Amino acid sequence: EYGVTLDSVSFNDIVISDTATIGSIVNQIPLGTIIFPNGSNTQIPALPSIISNDTINIDASDYFDFMTLHSGYLSVEIINNFPTDISNIDISLINMIDFSIIANFYFPLISSGSSVIDSISIAGLTIPENVVGILNNLDVNQSSGAVGINYDDALITNFTLSNLGFISASAIFPEQEIYVKKEEQIIDLDPI
């Protein structure tokens, strides 16, 4: 009988991305495609709570069913490719098994063309394969003049699990040698 611990297993960072385009947001605004036509140059007014209580399904089933961790980090990075600043971004990540809050993230301001990242420890947590991100709020700030409207410009949100140390897990581990036992064998080759 041999014991092998999960500490001997290496696991690559898990990155799950979500993209929200200007076009998808403009389509939600009454008369949005008329006020902000694709390819136009126009000033964007302040749009408080343009996104609120929007859900993002974070499906990690390609990587694991569940993980109970003794170490690890959860990071959220938001890349703002909109032509104007965004602010008051409030995100909650919810465990869909017991509906507990895994993490809350708040970003007061993300300038146009920049990105921000925040990270928390998830040591001691059990993370299921299905987590829901709730974008509680996102404000679009007024532009400082006319800006180009390109419906393909997007906010990109990357959720990253890194430096994972497992207590237990049901996961798809990368192919690797976890345990090797070498034994010396003595073979008598003398003829009978």
What are these model-predicted stretches?
Residues 1-192:
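Extracellular/secretory-pathway and virion-surface proteins
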